[in-house]
Amino acid sequence: GATTTRLRKDMRIAPGSLWPDAVFTAPAPGDDAEAVVRSGRIRDSYERLRTMAFAYNQPNTGHTHDPELLKCTLRGLEHMNAEVYRAGRETYGNWYHWRIGAPQAMQDACVLLYEHVPAESLARYLAAVDHFVPDREVEDRPGVS
């Protein structure tokens, strides 16, 4: 509960970020070190949204079924899709954040909030996963889907 309280309090939706300490906009070309940091912040932002989704769903968190927390979390998912994690977007930084870290946390949040995520939004979120993790990249890896 305390972590979610802090995340919700600190959340400031702005171009290129959901939290001031987690700016994820693409860095200047050639700045490979900063690209890795910023791609990690995409994953970090989705992990924070997942934490908020857990708190919304779990009993006794102090945030269980809190409509304002739900609204904030859904706005965060929409912002991430509009700003950075969307089909057709070019990647930067570390492949792990685009192919594993971010989509795993985002999909966890969507499962937790499934009945509240509009179908059109969910379709866009999953299209982004399909874009960054195309079948051709995982078809030769048994047990991976």
What residue spans do the PLM features occupy?
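Aromatic-lined, polymer-binding surfaces characteristic
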Residues: 4, 8-145
